[in-house]
Each structure stands twice: as structure tokens, then as C-alpha cells.
Regions:
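Transmembrane beta-strands of outer-membrane beta-barrel pores
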Residues: 1-2, 31, 48-54, 96-102, ...
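Internal, well-ordered domain-core segments that constitute the primary functional module
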Residues: 2-118
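Extracellular loop and loop/strand-boundary signature of outer-membrane beta-barrel proteins
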Residues: 9-15, 61-66, 140-144, 198-203, ...
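Outer-membrane beta-barrel "beta-signal"
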Residues: 24, 371-386
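Short loop/turn motifs that connect adjacent beta-strands in outer-membrane beta-barrel proteins
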Residues: 32-44, 81-93, 160-168, 219-225, ...
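Membrane-embedded beta-strand positions of outer-membrane beta-barrel proteins
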Residues: 44-46, 92-96, 167-171, 228-230, ...
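Long, internal scaffold/assembly segments composed of regular secondary structure
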Residues: 92-94, 102-247
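C-terminal structural cap/anchor segments
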Residues: 235-328
């Protein structure tokens, strides 16, 4: 997870760490490769893989609602850093993260209520379309979209490194299509026999409302509160509440109701029932009706995290999140649902042994996730067993 603290952040919206990892082949520049005298740096990756939750999807849905088999995975990301690490305290990081779920077989209900499997593309052209965001899905005719479930985030971070502290302020803007990626869509189609012809250079502009904003403060000489993170997330807009494909009679083309993390053909941005981005999007694993879909993707949330050391051997971590959810555009909650999540963790490192023992306690309170309590014990060995 890039440009955010992996231990304290609520998580990236595209390439998060909430779900089981997807087995993949990856080519990457994991650290910044600098040029222009050290003032510029780039890093990134390209990856292809295969999802492994076919059996889970069949069991969870009982093969009575939409699921996929043998789906493939693609992700890519590129980041640019501006600023010299040794000559300036200020630096800027910009990035684009994108991912695609494609291939395999999609099982979904048709108008007669029967569950029918559709074989998606798996040839070289499908791998290329996943990379460039092109092509169209099997069965699409009049209204063609790109092949697979495509999504991503524009990310940015400004850093200031002072002698005794470091501050990073960052943003993560998620998108599911061009309306949120570029904030515009073509809206100049003709009518009648020319309803599929782009007659005018007219575009519909979309607001920048959905965003994740965060601040990360590191106190270099304060071990008891070494790092503090605060984040705000807003996802209610989703390019607006209206969706309309242009027709012969009504040429207006509106691309709203983006329905984050869901997809009409595939089972959305999830793996083994857990969303693969930010966990504040309610994971399908919580669904009591056995459907693989995200039922709450329109929400406002505040998140905070603090970590530090109480002694040389004892570290701690505290997380707190409050959230208000409205469901989805297609299935709104009758009343907004709220949730409060808290977690406290302590980690003890046994001196000169390589052993660590961590204990954590967490709870959820509210109507969004219900009232839950959890405990976790972790034992870690670093180095060689003797």
C-alpha cells in the first residue's frame, strides 16, 4: 500500500491490504529510481494473477446468485516523486493506481430467473485490454464498455521533513469509469438515425466530491506517540444519482450511479468475501442473503490511528473509526446506519531473541456492522530458529 501508513491508515481505495492476496506475477520498481540530479524519481509495477475464491463463491451463494469462476487479475501503478531528499525538506508524490478483474466464467441471472454462465475473454487480446482499459465484454452490443471490471485511484501526497517531525498530507480519489477518472463524458450525440453519432463537441462535467483525505504526523523525538494519522472519507456522490444511456429520442448521456466496488457481470472488487480496497466499503462477507456484492458503498467516515513505544520492548497501536452509511444508489438504507470501530494492540519484543508477541482487542458498535467484539493473539519469530 503506497503513500499511506500500512499500520495506521484505514487503507487505500484501490490497491488495499484488506483481503487475501491474489497469487500473481509482478514486475516492479519497488523503490524510487531517481534521475534529473535526484530531483525526480519514479516507481511502479505491472502484475497479472488469478483469483482463488471460486469454491468460496459457490458455497457462499449456494449457486443461486451471481458468482464467477477462474477470474483473472491485473493491476498496475506508477508514481512520480518531485523533490531532492538531501537538498529540500518539501517533496511531492503523484500516482495512478489501476486494476482489472477479467476473464473466467460469469454466472448471473437472466430475465427468466435462471442462472446462466457466460465465458469471458481470456486470449491475448483480453490481457492487452486489461492493460490499456479497452475492448468490451462478451454480449455487449449497442452500449459497449471496456472489457472487465476496471477501477482505480488518483493518489497524491505532500511531505515536509523537519528536524524533529515529519508531516505528510495525502489524497486518494477513487474511480470506476471515465466520469470519475476524468470528470467528464461525451454528451453530444445526435437523434433519430444519427443517435450513435457524436455530432457535437459537448461534454458533461462531473464534480470532484468523492475523496479520501489524510494527514500523517511523525514525531521523531517522541517515542510514546511516534506517529499519528487522521483520515476523512466521502463516497456519496459517485458521479451523481442519474444514469441514462443516450437513445434515438433522448440524446443526453449521463454516467452517474457508479456503484463503487460492484459490477454488472463480475462479482466486484473483492476476494474471499473481503473488499480488496478500503474496508469501510462493507465487504460481501457480511451479507446474510448469500450475495457477493457490496451493499454499502456510499458513506462518510472519520478515522484516526496512533502508534508509539511505552518502553524499548513494548509498542502499542490504537485505531478508531466512525462511519455513517447510506447503502447504494440501487438499494438505499431506509435510514442512515452508523458504526463505531475501536482497536487496541500491544506488541512485546523479547530482547535478543527475535520473538514478538502481540495481543489485540477490537469492537464494532452500531447498526451498520452490528455489535461485535474480537480478540487476536500473534506470535512472530524473526531470524533463524535455534
Amino acid at each position: 500500500m503506497e503513500l499511506k501508513d500500512n499500520a495506521l491508515s484505514s487503507g487505500s481505495q484501490t490497491l488495499g491490504i484488506n483481503a487475501r492476496p491474489v497469487p500473481q506475477v509482478r514486475v516492479a520498481l519497488p523503490d524510487y529510481w531517481t534521475f534529473a540530479g535526484g530531483w525526480l524519481g519514479i516507481k511502479g509495477h505491472i502484475a497479472y494473477g488469478k483469483f482463488t475464491d471460486d469454491g468460496w463463491q459457490k458455497d457462499f451463494t449456494d449457486q443461486k446468485s451471481k458468482y464467477t469462476e477462474d477470474a483473472l487479475y491485473h493491476s498496475k501503478a506508477g508514481y512520480l516523486r518531485v523533490g531532492h531528499a538531501e537538498k529540500t525538506r518539501l517533496s511531492l508524490e503523484l500516482g495512478l493506481e489501476m486494476a482489472t478483474l477479467f476473464g473466467g466464467t460469469s454466472y448471473r441471472k437472466w430475465e427468466n430467473g435462471q442462472l446462466v454462465g457466460v465465458k469471458n475473454g481470456t486470449g491475448l487480446s483480453s490481457f492487452w485490454n486489461a492493460f490499456i482499459g479497452g475492448g468490451s465484454d462478451v454480449g455487449e452490443d449497442v452500449y459497449k464498455n471496456v472489457e472487465g471490471d476496471n477501477l482505480g485511484s488518483w493518489v497524491a501526497r505532500v511531505n515536509y521533513d523537519a528536524p524533529t517531525w515529519n508531516l505528510g498530507v495525502y489524497a486518494d480519489h477513487f474511480f470506476e469509469d471515465h466520469s470519475a477518472m476524468f470528470h467528464l463524458s461525451h454528451n453530444g450525440y445526435g437523434t433519430g438515425e444519427e443517435w450513435q453519432v457524436k455530432k457535437e463537441n459537448r461534454f458533461y462535467l462531473y464534480d470532484l466530491k468523492d475523496i479520501m483525505l489524510g494527514a500523517e504526523l511523525t514525531l521523531k523525538s517522541c517515542p510514546w506517540a511516534r506517529k499519528i494519522v487522521v483520515e476523512y472519507l466521502y463516497t456519496k456522490y459517485q458521479s451523481g444519482a442519474l444514469y441514462h444511456d443516450h437513445t434515438a429520442n433522448i440524446p443526453d448521456h449521463l454516467c452517474g450511479t457508479d456503484n463503487y466496488y460492484n459490477h454488472g457481470i463480475f462479482t466486484g472488487w473483492q476476494h474471499w468475501g473481503q473488499v480488496m480496497g478500503n474496508p469501510l466499503y462493507t465487504s460481501p462477507l457480511y451479507n446474510a442473503d448469500g450475495t457477493v456484492q457490496v451493499k454499502n458503498n456510499r458513506f462518510v467516515a472519520w478515522h484516526a490511528g496512533v502508534s508509539g513505544s511505552l518502553s524499548r520492548a513494548l509498542d502499542y497501536r490504537l485505531l478508531a473509526t466512525c462511519q455513517k452509511g447510506w447503502g447504494t444508489y440501487g438499494n438505499m438504507f431506509p435510514h442512515p446506519r452508523r458504526n463505531l470501530s475501536l482497536m487496541a494492540e500491544a506488541t512485546y519484543s523479547i530482547p535478543k531473541s527475535g520473538w514478538q508477541v502481540a495481543a489485540a482487542a477490537a469492537l464494532d458498535k452500531g447498526s451498520l456492522l452490528g455489535d461485535n467484539v474480537g480478540l487476536q493473539l500473534t506470535v512472530v519469530k524473526k531470524g533463524v530458529f535455534k
